[in-house]
Amino acid sequence: MAGNFLKYDGPLTVADLPVDAHEFIALCAPRPVFISGGATNGDGWVDAKGMFMAAAAAGPVYKLLGRKDLGTTVFPPIETPLIDGDIAFRQHTGGHTPAPNWPTFLEFASRYLHAPESTQAK
């Protein structure tokens, strides 16, 4: 196991990590990032609003590099895709699974990934 991982293994809290999620997202700039999750269902494993806030906070780095951010800092209603920028976000009602966001991810990714004509469906 990586030695640095052991520093954060155990009874530590979020405040013990020396970086925040928006900094990790900003490190991806200027590359596209799709952030998705299910609605919070009381299990404590999903923090959709926190995910959104991190995506929005990474926006200035994307803009600095000439790319588009989320386009808003207002948390959207569930099932509302924000996919016009280079950072994308969508929250679904399907629980703790990525499957309901796949169609939206594919729509977002299609702007960046182009299949050769011979492999495209006709």
Tell what function each PLM region has:
Residues 28-29, 33, 38, 63-67, ...:
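Hydrophobic alpha-helix feature that most strongly marks membrane-spanning transmembrane helices
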Residues 1-24, 47, 51-74:
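Mobile cap/lid helix-loop segments that gate and shape the active-site cleft of serine hydrolases
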Residues 14, 21-25, 32-33, 53-56, ...:
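Aromatic-enriched hydrophobic runs in primary sequence
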Residues 29-48, 91-95:
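Conserved strand-to-loop "acid loop" that flanks and positions the catalytic carboxylate
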Residues 24-27, 78:
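N-proximal short alpha-helices
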Residues 56-57, 62-122:
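C-terminal catalytic histidine-bearing segment of alpha/beta-hydrolase fold enzymes
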Residues 27-33, 82-87:
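Short, proline-enriched alpha-helix->beta-strand connector loops that line the catalytic pocket
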